[in-house]
A protein has these predicted regions:
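Generic N-terminal amphipathic, Lys/Arg-enriched alpha-helix
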Residues: 1-24
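A short, well-structured juxtamembrane/interface segment
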Residues: 24-42
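Glycine-rich phosphate-binding loops that contact phosphosugars or nucleotide phosphates
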Residues: 54, 59-191
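Hydrophobic beta-strand scaffold residues
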Residues: 46-47, 141
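Structured helix-beta-strand junction loops
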Residues: 17, 42-43, 111, 155
Length: 191
C-alpha cells in the first residue's frame, strides 16, 4: 500500500466512525456539558484521567478549561489526575498502578465534582477503580470508552461509547467530543 492509499484508508476510517455518532450519543455529549457546567457553576472541580494517549487527552482537555477554549475568560477548576508525576509514581510504588487515579480522587473529590475517565478499551483497572471511587465520594462520573466498553461499561453515571476497534479512531473521537463539551461549557456558563 502506498502512502496516498494509506492516507485515504485512515481518512475513510475516521469518516466512518464520525458518521456513527448518532443522536443518542450527541444527547449524551450535551448532557455531559450540562452536568459539568452545573458543577463548575457551583464551585465544583472537574477531574480527568486516562492512560497513554488518553492521559495526554485528559491533560489537553483539562487545560482547555483552565486556560481557554474559544474565548478569553476566567479559569475553570479542572485537574488532570495524570499530570502529577510525583503522585503517580508514589501511588504506583506504594499502592499499585491500579490506584494511581482512584487514590487521588479519594483525597480530592467531593460531592458536586465530576470525573471524566477516558479509556479506549474500557479494560484499564485504574479507570475502573476510579469510577468505583467516584461513587464512594459521590462524584458524578462520565466515561469516554471505545470498542465494546470493556469492564468499565455501565460503571459510570454517564457513558459515551465510540463503536470502533481502532485505538487511533477512538482517541480522535474522544478528543473531538471533549472539545465539543468545552465549547458547550463556555456557552452554557455564558463566559
Amino acid at each position: 500500500m502506498n502512502d496516498i492509499n494509506l492516507n485515504e484508508k485512515h481518512f475513510l476510517e475516521h469518516e466512518t466512525v464520525l458518521k456513527s455518532i448518532n443522536k443518542y450519543t450527541k444527547k449524551k455529549i450535551s448532557r455531559a456539558a450540562e452536568i459539568i457546567s452545573k458543577s463548575l457553576k457551583n464551585k465544583g472541580t472537574v477531574y480527568w484521567c486516562g492512560n497513554g494517549g488518553s492521559a495526554s487527552d485528559s491533560l489537553h482537555l483539562s487545560t482547555e478549561l483552565i486556560g481557554r477554549f474559544n474565548k478569553n475568560r476566567k479559569p475553570l477548576k479542572s485537574v488532570s489526575l495524570a499530570s502529577n508525576s510525583t503522585s503517580l509514581t508514589c501511588i504506583a510504588n506504594d499502592f499499585g498502578y491500579d490506584k494511581i487515579f482512584s487514590r487521588q480522587l479519594e483525597a480530592l473529590g467531593k460531592k458536586g465534582d465530576v470525573v471524566i475517565a477516558l479509556s479506549t478499551s474500557g479494560n484499564s483497572e485504574n479507570i475502573l477503580q476510579t469510577l468505583n471511587q467516584a461513587k464512594k465520594n459521590r462524584v458524578y462520573s462520565i466515561s469516554f470508552l471505545g470498542k465494546n466498553g470493556g469492564k468499565c461499561k455501565d460503571k459510570a453515571d454517564l457513558e459515551i461509547l465510540i463503536n470502533s476497534k481502532s485505538t487511533a479512531r477512538i482517541q480522535e473521537m474522544h478528543i473531538t467530543i471533549g472539545q465539543i463539551i468545552c465549547d458547550l461549557i463556555e456557552k452554557k456558563l455564558k463566559l
